[in-house]
Amino acid sequence: ALSEDALRAGGYGAVYACGPMPMLSYVKRIAESAGIPCYISMESRMACGMGVCLGCTIHTSEGNKRCCKDGPVFDSRILEFPKPVSKPARKALDGVPDLSIAIGDVRLKNPVIASSGTFGFGTEYASVFDGGKLGGIASKGLTLEAREGNTGIRLWETPSGLMNSIGLQNPGIAHFIDFELPEMLKLKTVTIANLSGSTLETYVEGAKLLDKTAVPIIELNISCPNVAAGGAAWGMTCANAETAVREVRAVTKKPLIVKLTPQAPDFTGVALACIRSGADALSIGNSFQGVAVDIERGVPVFDKIKAGFGGPAVRPIAVRLVWETFEAMRSLPPHERVPIVAVGGIEKWEDAVEFIMAGALAVGVGTNTFANP
C-alpha cells in the first residue's frame, strides 16, 4: 500500500493522482507530509464542458474553481476534501430477512405493490409473471358505474416516460365484485381495490359495496375530478380531500390507502388533512399532468388535452413529495403517523431503496411494468 515512507524512499519529484475522492484525500495528506509536490486531477459532474453551467465547480482555498476550464489538474495545496465518512456496518443476516409490512391491520409479505391501472386485475400477467411474488396488487380504478373511458389516442411515449389518457375504463364495481375479485383473491398476495368516483355519493356507495366483500384493503383515489367543484380533482384542496376521506371512512372499517394528486398546491396540507380524516396510509406520486401537441396536425394529441404522465422523469419530484410529507408528519404524535406508499418512476431496486430512505414504507411500480413485466 502507498505510504508516506514509500513516497520518501522512492525519491519522487512530484506525485500525480486521479481516482475516487477518499483516495485523493489520502494521497494529498501523505504527499504534503512527505514534502513532495502533489497534483490532483479532479472530476466533477458537468453539463456543458464549456465553463457555463458551473456544475463542475469545486471549492478551494483560492475560491471556486471550474474543473472543465480551470483544471482538471490542481495543486493539492489549494484543494479541500471533506472528512471521510464511514459506511454503516452491514449486519449479518440470519436466514431470509423479514420484508413484511403492515397497512392498518393487514400484513403484506413485502413492500412492493403493483400500482393501479398498470396490472389489470392481477391475472392478465399470469403467463409472464407470478403476481404472488408481490406484496400487493392494486386493481384498475373502479367506479360505481361501468365506464368506457376516453376516445382518441390513449398512450403517447416521451423520451423519459409515458403519457396516458385511459379515462378510468372499467367494468364497474358490481362486475368487479362478482367476476374479478374472486380471481384476484386466489392470488398469493394482498388484493387492493382502487376506488374512484366523480361525486361524494359515488365514492360512498362504492365503498359500501366493497366493504361487504373480502377485499383486504381499499385505495381511495382522490385524483378524480369533483363534478360539484367544476371538475377539479378531489385532492386539490384540503377541505375537499378531508370531506372525501371522512365520508368514505365512515362507511368502511377496511384499511384505507388514500392516493393523492401531485398537482395539489398545498400537497403536505392535503396529506395531513387525509390523515386527520382517517387515512391508514398515503399513496404518493400518482400521475403528473402533461400536454402533448401533434406538430404534424397542429392539435393536441389527446382528446381530453391533458393526460397523466409517469416514468423515470417524475421520480425526483415524487421523491421530494415523499420527503416533504414524511417531514410534515413529524409534527404529529408517533401514533398518528401513517405509512407512505411511494409511486413514481421506479425501474430498479435502487429506486425503491431511495424512496424508502426518503420516508416510504412501501413502493408501487407502475409504468415500468409496461417496459419489463
Q: What residue spans do the PLM features occupy?
A:
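Reductase modules of NAD(P)H-dependent flavoproteins
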Residues: 1-92
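Glycine-rich phosphate-binding active-site loops on the catalytic face of alpha/beta enzymes
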Residues: 20, 138-144, 222-224, 281-292, ...
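N-terminal capping/small domains of soluble enzymes
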Residues: 93-191, 196-204, 373
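Catalytic cores of alpha/beta
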Residues: 53-55, 123-129, 201-212, 264-277, ...
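Alpha/beta catalytic cores of nucleotide-metabolism and tRNA/nucleoside-modifying enzymes
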Residues: 68, 87-96, 309-337, 347-373
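C-terminal helical cap(s) of enzyme catalytic domains, especially alpha/beta-barrels
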Residues: 73-83, 149-160, 293-306, 368-373
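Glycine/Thr-rich beta-alpha phosphate-binding loop at enzyme active sites
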Residues: 162-163, 170, 224-240, 270, ...
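Glycine-rich beta-to-alpha transition loops that act as phosphate-gripper elements at the mouths
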Residues: 119, 194-197, 260-266, 335-350
